[in-house]
Amino acid sequence: MGLNINRPRRGSLAFSPRKRAKRPVPRIRSWPEEDTVRLQAFPVYKAGMSHAFIKEDNPKSPNAGQEVFTPITILEAPPINVCAIRVYGRNERNYLTTLTEVWADNLDKELERKIKLPKKEDRKTVEDLEALKDKIEDVRVLVHTNPKLTCLPKKKPEILEIRIGGKDIEERLNYAKEILGKQLNITDVFQEGELVDTIGVTKGKGFQGQVKRWGVKIQFGKHARKGVGRHVGSIGPWQPKMVMWSVPMPGQMGYHQRTEYNKRILKIGNNGDEITPKGGFLHYGVIRNNYVVLKGSVQGPAKRLIVLRRAIRPQEPLIKVPEITYISTTSKQGK
């Protein structure tokens, strides 16, 4: 009986095909079910990272009650505008389909940079929703960001769809009517100590080879002497005369939409001077609006739009407000 060696394949096929995301604004396909009537997500901009000392409040941790060095990510959260209500129903195949949209009257003029707005005489009104109340299965709102309030070099807003949580359709509709045409802040959606999921597009790495893209083992010996060590030894058999889709090949790496679960909100503030490092964040600048401090890292480069979604599978409900003793604001310029 020979030696049994377990050597799993290099790289994961879970995210194939590894191609570029269609757009930098993430698309959310899953939403958590909850009883509270509120927005379930909020868009923010990634500013950069720093570190902090936080008192460990997990009683099961060996460091309970002690100050712990923690990497943090700072995200700028300018207010968002609720520009439309979108309601969904079921079609003959039992799929969710859009029934109608109700747009606000006081739309921001910057929104015309992004989409062609419907004419006022063609717009549906809030009264039209009452006739569809029996067919409505889901209630969501269209919101747009305000990058002009930040130090980002753009004015064109991003538009995304956010679901309103809750069990009762009528309560969700009333809440949507209440916030239509208004500005919402991060404090209207999340609170300190809450767990959120971060959804965004990762850093783009361009065209990369098999070793970096899939983690293929570098070949040594005669292969290295021939200068062909960084490749796959065999891409398939003689028969069938084809290359399987699962063979590691060079191609696009990065700029994929990814979701990271259960990031804890350590702090929500409105004074950017207390969190901005000396000289500003690299490739971003200074914080001018509300901000969110998350524990750990977040996908994507600086300036990338990240959507904070209410945790869809939280480990445990940690709603304690963390005790932060120190946040580093030293210069990130390397001086």
From Swiss-Prot:
One of its GO terms (biological process) is translation. The keyword Protease does not apply. GO terms for cellular component: cytosolic large ribosomal subunit. Pfam families: Ribosomal_L3 (PF00297). Keywords: Ribonucleoprotein, Ribosomal protein, RNA-binding, rRNA-binding. SUPFAM superfamilies: Translation proteins (SSF50447). InterPro entries: L3_arc_euk (IPR045077), Ribosomal_L3_dom_3_arc_sf (IPR044892), Ribosomal_uL3 (IPR000597), Ribosomal_uL3_arc (IPR019928), Ribosomal_uL3_CS (IPR019926), Transl_B-barrel_sf (IPR009000). GO terms for molecular function: RNA binding; rRNA binding; structural constituent of ribosome. Part of the 50S ribosomal subunit. Forms a cluster with proteins L14 and L24e. Belongs to the universal ribosomal protein uL3 family. HAMAP family: Ribosomal_uL3_A. One of the primary rRNA binding proteins, it binds directly near the 3'-end of the 23S rRNA, where it nucleates assembly of the 50S subunit. This is Large ribosomal subunit protein uL3. It comes from Methanocaldococcus jannaschii (strain ATCC 43067 / DSM 2661 / JAL-1 / JCM 10045 / NBRC 100440) (Methanococcus jannaschii). The lineage of its organism: Archaea, Methanobacteriati, Methanobacteriota, Methanomada group, Methanococci. The gene is rpl3.
